[in-house]
Amino acid sequence: MPSDASTGYVDDQPGDEAYKRGALYKQTKARRADYDSDKEAKRPCTEDSDVALAGTSEEKEARLPKRKVAVMVGYCGTGYHGMQYNPPNRTIEAELFEAFVKAGAISRANSTDLKKNGFMRAARTDKGVHAGGNVISLKLIIEDPAIKDKINEHLPPGIRVWGISRVNKAFDCRKLCGSRWYEYLLPTYSFIGPKPNTYLARTIEQCGEAASEKPDRDQESLDFWEAFRKAVDEKFTQEEQDAIVNYVAPSKEDFDENSGLYQKVKQYKQMENAHRRSYRVSSAKLARFREAMKQYLGPHNFHNYTLGKDFKDPSTVRFMKDITVSDPFVIGEMKTEWVSIKIHGQSFMLHQIRKMISMATLVARCNCSPERIAQSYGPQKINIPKAPALGLLLESPVYEGYNKRLLEFGYEPIDFRNYQKEMDTFKMVHIYDKIYKEEVDENVFNAFFNYIDAFNQVTGAQGEPTKSHDPAKIQLSIIDFLLPCSSSPQENASPEAQKAPETPAGDNTISAEQPKTATEVPTTQSDA
């Protein structure tokens, strides 16, 4: 076709050189390069081509079917950022997934994404929380009869697979879990009343003088602290005691570990710690705690036992099926006495168990009526502190209802009782012993309750309710709730007591969801 101006037609298509300089050419060239590269990678090499082809054929023949299974696991949560897969953080699921791949239970093609395998957990545990038993459901290659042992070979000692059971394709371990058992280990010295002259001790004393709603006199705790006072009087002069009480740690640059005053303070704390660990709970004190825990049985509105939930939110109603508190037992070189609390509930909200334990323990510490707990289910907002995560562990999910359907389908039921002996041994070595040791090394529970005993700041709104301010939305501190006779604790406290105490040693982190207040106390462990 003519392209000169005389014809009235101008060729608007670029020439070869102009085309090669354009963006479209560069993009097309890049695509061709990618195509050629892929084609080259797929083409068997000319040398040893028979081996390459044979290898490809063998890989296709070795491809095995995936089966939907329930994997029963146990783990120690220390050192992990919880159960749920959350890269780049180190989690339990990340360890399990890697072990599945290394053992051949998950193919390399499916080793990059949990979703490809239908990964789901029955109960998500938070940072530092352990599980004697938990269940995950996913698709695995289980043709190898020794697959469980191979998986365990690739797992650290603190994570174990108890069993692998075939389930039907519709199985969802979280949705079909009928209920869950949790256990909480608590040192009995947590039940001792607050140390004399702390804010909480003065508040209880003030309530004891009130005409109504006063707590019972806690003679057991008074005798305990009187015995400690006598031991201190024998060890230190009054001048030394005053210096110890008023001791303020110097800056790191000025700190002298060999100073006489610091050594006195250290001796005093060691005496107090040893005296506390020698405590043995009385039957009356333990009975009060057991009665407090019984208040949780049945369906209740637990909106005060979690975060961000309103009284009218229907999801806050939870059903507790059974609660047991063991007899006291003594563990470890320090001869600390403990109790085990087991809670069986249909489901639990964030922090719920730790707040339940905290409330019941404070009932015992304040020696007030266990029936106060029943009033926490009402619309009044209460700021309940979380007990340390250290003592919490998931005992096991329960599939009582769904196990009947599994039997009908010809599958084995999901029952942790088949592995109870192995689980008990594992818990003693990898969970219980670590809990006991960490409590002794860090004084976790002592730091937590000392912080509450000393902190007097009322959280939430203060002042008289107005027409535009619902009194139920005025957030009470846990102390104001348990001891309503202390109507104005700030007015009755000394100037020194009104100062917020220092955070327990070893904890300087405050999460966004847990403000540093009198009742949301930072602990040395994270949530459960």
From Swiss-Prot:
Q: Which CDD domains match?
A: PseudoU_synth_PUS1_PUS2
Q: Which cofactor(s) does the record list?
A: Zn(2+)
Q: Where is the active site?
A: 126
Which SUPFAM superfamilies does this chain map to? Answer: Pseudouridine synthase (SSF55120)
Basic and acidic residues bias (residue ranges): 31-46
Q: Which GO terms describe its biological process?
A: mRNA processing; mRNA pseudouridine synthesis; snRNA pseudouridine synthesis; tRNA pseudouridine synthesis
| Nucleus recorded as keyword | yes
Q: Where is this region: Disordered?
A: 1-59, 486-528
For this UniProt record, the keywords arranged alphabetically read as follows: Isomerase, Metal-binding, mRNA processing, Nucleus, tRNA processing, Zinc
Location within or outside the cell: Nucleus
Function in brief? Formation of pseudouridine at positions 27 and 28 in the anticodon stem and loop of transfer RNAs; at positions 34 and 36 of intron-containing precursor tRNA(Ile) and at position 35 in the intron-containing tRNA(Tyr). Catalyzes pseudouridylation at position 44 in U2 snRNA. Also catalyzes pseudouridylation of mRNAs.
Please state what the protein is called.
tRNA pseudouridine synthase 1
The species this protein was found in? Eremothecium gossypii (strain ATCC 10895 / CBS 109.51 / FGSC 9923 / NRRL Y-1056) (Yeast)
